[in-house]
Amino acid sequence: ENAIKAGAHKITIPLSVSETHSQANLRKTHAQVLEEVVKIVDLIKTLPENERPHFEGGLSTAFGCTLEGHVPQAKVVEMAEKLVELGCSEVGLADTTGYANPLQVKNMVNAVWAAVGREKLKGIHLHNTRGQGLANVMAALDIGLDTLDSSLGGLGGCPFAPGASGNIVTEDLVFLLDSMGLKTGINLDKLMSVRDIVTAALPDEQMYGFTPDASLPKGYVQTLNGGTGWGTGN
């Protein structure tokens, strides 16, 4: 309700595919979370169509769970179908624990697309716990996803996913995309300046990122209208 009053253009509700994680993280079963989905959908429907926020069902622990271990692909698909059936505008896949690998990303996306349609899954939320974050980004891009979650300095994590680090690092992600000539609209120099602000404000938080540590390559000039072409063979 507060998000809608504030004019949020997008709202995401997390649904852990691992019910053990759901009960630990949200203190709710799948059934209880789905009840919340119905309430939010009903609330959104009371608004004029041009004022309705986009409502995403985020499928947490879609690639594995530190509490349950393996999460079956069929269970992820089942939960995606339920969220769409109840009225979510789209679903998103989240590698909460950093278990995913590139082949798994492609297979999972294809399975969910087959169930709910490509228009209902456009984004993915990745962690770099085991060093596969950007490799998974490449798999997601290759298959056609265009919404990639990340966080400045890789901040974040989940208290109920022991050992999981934060999201993929925004600074590294933007450099990766820009160096391949993909437009992000994000100024790398200004992004690095923001990192300095956060580092000063949170001196006890570990900040991650290879690009900030190594700095941009010598002679690298960003062009915000679509990258530099580095790494494209030019």
Enumerate the language-model features and the residues they cover:
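Catalytic cores and adjacent flexible loops of soluble metabolic enzymes
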Residues: 1-234
